[in-house]
């Protein structure tokens, strides 16, 4: 498995921004819930992008925030002409519904998603959108990494998360995409609307992976991973082991809904690898 991942990673060509995308319109969609500490920085990060401001807008969907997120957004809108704000209705909740609402509000060619607590370079939009000049490309998965912190637990998370991102990228390199991360993901709006009805709406989260699977099945060979330092989106590691375990439980819960063969095989191999490591640790005392 490791050899296959290495081969898949090497197959991905490093990205070089040689030709600017011609007049592709972009909507950056962010779902927010109680993000008052992050919104100002997020908007400033997006306003500083080197992509033509007339070709992109920012759509923030408020997912029932109970802090000052909505008030901060309204103040930011006075200073940012391409910022759009909307809130989920009472009977709708969660990131999946927020993204769907944002896509329906958009009229752009390309949808680019990230999270409120993320940071990225000023050329992030330009890089993520560039490959869509090729009309055969429908989805681009971008790199995501944790901020390095002075904490053993945080750095362990960073290493583990890096292996997940690398594995996902390698599978794309092998033309067998299995997962991606909505914190750094771009796709054609019309393709999203085309396949959205087939995405499992009984699963609360995981819309990024299910979207990737449906695009993979309908448009084979149309998914890329962007191997570029300038395209990395940085996010925060979890603060404690409890949150880490809960996150992994959420991820595992949606795996029962996966129907993609490649994803099931990779998940099984990873499970067996981890199980063998645990077994080795348990048996090691008997060797002394």
Question: Where are the language model's segments positioned?
Answer:
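Alpha-helical bilayer-embedded segments of polytopic membrane proteins, i.e.
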Residues: 1-5, 255-288
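N-terminal membrane-anchoring/stem segments of glycan-assembly enzymes
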Residues: 1-22, 158, 167, 280
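Cell-envelope/extracellular polymer assembly enzymes that use nucleotide-activated donors
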Residues: 24-27, 57
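Short, acidic, metal-binding catalytic loop of nucleotide-sugar glycosyltransferases
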Residues: 44-55
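A conserved acidic beta->alpha catalytic loop
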Residues: 62-71, 118
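Glycine-rich, basic loop-to-helix element that forms the pyrophosphate-binding segment
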Residues: 88-106, 127
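Short aromatic/hydrophobic "clamp" motif used to bind/position activated sugar donors
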Residues: 111
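Catalytic donor/gating beta->alpha subdomain of glycosyltransferases that bind UDP-sugars
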Residues: 132-165, 193, 198-263
């Amino acid at each position: 498995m490791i050899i296959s991942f290495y081969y898949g990673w090497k197959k991905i060509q490093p990205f070089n921004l040689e030709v600017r995308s011609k007049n592709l319109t972009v909507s950056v969609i962010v779902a927010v819930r109680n993000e008052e500490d992050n919104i100002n920085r997020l908007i400033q990060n997006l306003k500083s992008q080197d992509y033509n401001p007339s070709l992109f807008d920012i759509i923030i969907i408020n997912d029932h925030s109970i802090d000052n997120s909505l008030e901060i957004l309204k103040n930011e809108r006075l200073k940012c002409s391409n910022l759009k704000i909307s809130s989920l209705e009472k009977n709708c909740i969660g990131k999946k519904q927020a993204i769907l609402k944002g896509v329906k509000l958009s009229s752009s060619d390309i949808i680019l998603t990230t999270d409120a607590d993320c940071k990225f370079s000023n050329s992030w939009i330009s890089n993520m959108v560039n490959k869509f000049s090729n009309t055969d490309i429908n989805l681009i998965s971008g790199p995501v990494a944790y901020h390095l912190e002075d904490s053993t637990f945080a750095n362990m998370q960073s290493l583990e998360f890096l292996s997940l991102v690398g594995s996902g990228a390698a599978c794309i390199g092998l033309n067998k995409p299995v997962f991606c991360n909505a914190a750094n993901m771009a796709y054609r709006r019309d393709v999203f609307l085309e396949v959205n009805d087939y995405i499992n709406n009984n699963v609360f989260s995981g819309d990024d992976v299910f979207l990737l699977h449906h695009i993979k099945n309908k448009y084979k060979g149309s998914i890329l991973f962007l191997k570029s330092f300038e395209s990395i989106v940085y996010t925060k590691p979890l603060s404690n082991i409890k949150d880490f375990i809960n996150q992994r439980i959420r991820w595992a819960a949606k795996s029962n809904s996966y129907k993609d063969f490649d994803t099931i095989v990779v998940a099984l191999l990873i499970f067996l690898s981890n199980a063998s490591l645990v077994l080795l640790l348990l048996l090691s005392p008997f060797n002394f």
